[in-house]
Amino acid sequence: MAQHTVYFPDAFLTQMREAMPSTLSFDDFLAACQRPLRRSIRVNTLKISVADFLQLTAPYGWTLTPIPWCEEGFWIERDNEDALPLGSTAEHLSGLFYIQEASSMLPVAALFADGNAPQRVMDVAAAPGSKTTQIAARMNNEGAILANEFSASRVKVLHANISRCGISNVALTHFDGRVFGVAVPEMFDAILLDAPCSGEGVVRKDPDALKNWSPESNQEIAATQRELIDSAFHALRPGGTLVYSTCTLNREENEAVCMWLKETYPDAVEFLPLGELFPAANKALTEEGFLHVFPQIYDCEGFFVARLRKTQAIPALPAPKYKVGNFPFSPVKDREAGQIRQAAAGVGLNWDENLRLWQRDKELWLFPVGIEALIGKVRFSRLGIKLAETHNKGYRWQHEAVIALATPDNVNAFELTPQEAEEWYRGRDVYPQAAPVADDVLVTFQHQPIGLAKRIGSRLKNSYPRELVRDGKLFTSNA
């Protein structure tokens, strides 16, 4: 694999020499940093099993190497890397996999380790959505996830990835993560804080990542991280699990932040060792039981992961002074809900008791039941999935609901050819050789739902959202 030149400040190299355990070679560290990062993907098990995914993609000649800490994760090598971007493959467009760095799969593995099965989870810094979608898959779309993102521009990307992966149990918020300890005290069974950091571990992806690095900046970032972990710890219920992670390598933003929390709440913080998380985890294990992953250990990004349990309640923070405002939705009455459910089933959309129908004007939404306890405590940017808009003749079913709820074995499902599917993703109407009979047609490709079409004569009218329409090379050019 080709080398690339990474910029290293002298003070950073000095700090790394001090931070690196004697069992590791500093020369190996430098050599690993100069190698470009291996690509990796995670199969979205909400859509397809790992076995079926491997069978589906076998004809492509991809080399898929299992990632030890994530059963559905693989390093991927392709002969035609430049011919077709991974993000333009049919399997990516339909949400069958997520392009995710291998080491960033570690925090969620830690969150669910040892049979942990939380029902209400918060992802404090969620965009672009790799970990939120991984959590949702581990929860099998059950329970509820609060996915928060402070950056307004990244909330849209977060929602797009959640929608593409067919996830229905997520509520999105857009806050500074420091508000949650006050706003929702002791409300969550598990919390992932993948904290904003100095990014020292990402030099293999971005050789200039350390251009603005300084020890002073690290100290400022660590101060913010202490405030974030304190807030998250307050939002965690007694007995709950908190995973703290970063993609940086210095001890100040990693071990020291966790030790600060333990010193602040000595009777309430218990570190849960991660040495048994996967075979060879002990190679990255610190004396506290954390994983401090230098890039040469597993040939991935540098990363840090700590897992802890809240063993008892801690004093509450002062009550919030802000007002959330009125919640603009109301629950749909049982009788009407039954009619809506029946109409939705007619086009192949089904849901279980984890989701409940709510209404706002002519909009129908499905919210995860587990999030209802948070209504009135935080303001949501987006909640659950938009099911439909009502109109005089019935319902206008929404694309995100089709992707999350459709069952491809529905009687009105219509399988497209590769060429027709590509036309669909380009936002064009499709003219199949033999048009389906039904007026509302569940469009599938590779037996995966990709949208809902209206049949008009022999034409299938495209309803693919304009913001998702693709141009450039798509999958048939790779056939």
UniProtKB/Swiss-Prot annotation:
The lineage of its organism: Bacteria, Pseudomonadati, Pseudomonadota, Gammaproteobacteria, Enterobacterales. Belongs to the class I-like SAM-binding methyltransferase superfamily. RsmB/NOP family. The keyword Transferase applies. Its EC number is 2.1.1.178. HAMAP family: 16SrRNA_methyltr_F. CDD domains: AdoMet_MTases. This is Ribosomal RNA small subunit methyltransferase F. Gene3D superfamilies: 3.10.450.720, Vaccinia Virus protein VP39. Keywords: Cytoplasm, Methyltransferase, RNA-binding, rRNA processing, S-adenosyl-L-methionine, Transferase.
